[in-house]
């Protein structure tokens, strides 16, 4: 990591000689992450961290829907990086449904199904909870989202690198991660 932070000084988006090594480093990282997550390299958007990734997922889907009263389904146990953008979107007219959990911290997929309305554009449920360790039934929830044609996001900052987190197997459309949670530097994330 130190080598990458110290040596390729150029802007990876520039076309000149100083940017080329940085561009190679970024693309190598993109390929490694895509192999690790089981997705295509072009599906990875690098961000400044997990919070920015979550903001892009929530706000991006909401604004792209074109529905000012669109519904987002999430849970009460989400990280503030999910809850705060949801509150922001509520201020703009979004309907955010917050689901409770059982005594193990588990979201009941049937409660997700019951919360869906014709206005639902996104379901966002964290993969693993950092406080109680609960691993959510993401594949079950993703099937429900698919049945209804709804996009599904999971904040996987706490799970990536600790448990299998393959995008295709989970069935998610959007997955957020934070670099510092898996031996990367602070200030790096991906969606």
PLM regions: where:
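Pyridoxal 5′-phosphate
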Residues: 1-191
């Amino acid at each position: 990591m130190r080598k990458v932070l110290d040596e390729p000084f150029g802007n990876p988006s520039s076309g000149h000689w100083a940017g080329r090594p940085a561009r190679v480093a970024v693309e190598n990282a993109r390929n490694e992450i895509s192999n690790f997550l089981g997705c295509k390299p072009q599906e990875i958007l690098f961000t400044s961290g997990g919070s920015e990734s979550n903001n892009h997922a929530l706000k991006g889907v909401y604004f792209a829907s074109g529905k000012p009263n669109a519904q987002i389904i999430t849970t009460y146990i989400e990280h503030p990086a999910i809850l705060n953008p949801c509150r922001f979107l509520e201020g703009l007219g979004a309907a955010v449904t917050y689901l409770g959990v059982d005594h193990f911290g588990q979201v009941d997929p049937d409660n997700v199904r019951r919360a869906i309305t014709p206005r639902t554009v996104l379901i966002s449920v964290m993969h693993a909870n950092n406080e109680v360790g609960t691993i959510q039934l993401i594949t079950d929830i993703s099937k429900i989202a698919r049945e209804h044609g709804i996009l599904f996001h999971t904040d996987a900052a706490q799970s990536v690198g600790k448990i299998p987190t393959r995008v295709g197997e989970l069935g998610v459309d959007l997955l957020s991660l934070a670099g510092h949670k898996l031996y990367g530097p602070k200030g790096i994330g991906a969606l």
